[in-house]
């Protein structure tokens, strides 16, 4: 399990990339099956009690992370692109069916799952509308939090049959 974090490929992007010793379909399953996503999505000791995924362009995603103190952090969004086993793109710019705009869009996430040797080159590119939003996300702990989650994702995907 090796990780590399690339901070700014563009002035508004944050990027995490790593090799996962599991086939792309297994890494994709961990992102696309609610019961699997709940097992790794939040950095421990946080949990993910809710994962509702309508995995199609225009489909709604509703994920809730719960902190150790019981505080819920809802994450709502819409899928923009779904290419099974290869690519997922979603955004929080919309929060429900009918393309209802969010009050404060923050990011669009582009996930790629590329076959590499005996595993997957996993890349999460998180695009922000402004440099200030990217900086806010960085200061919130993007690198540490997303790296922890990528480790949890890898452990789960590598154990899938």
Language model features with spans:
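Hydrophobic-ligand binding "helix-grip"
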Residues: 38, 42-43, 49-57, 62, ...
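General beta-strand recognition
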Residues: 15, 26-28, 62, 87-89, ...
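Beta-strand/loop substructures that line and gate deep hydrophobic ligand-binding cavities in soluble
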Residues: 98-144
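Short, flexible helix/strand-to-coil boundary loops that buttress conserved ligand/catalytic motifs
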Residues: 31, 41, 92, 150, ...
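Hydrophobic ligand-binding cavity/cleft-lining segments
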Residues: 1-47
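Short, highly charged C-terminal tails/helix-capping segments
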Residues: 50, 156-161
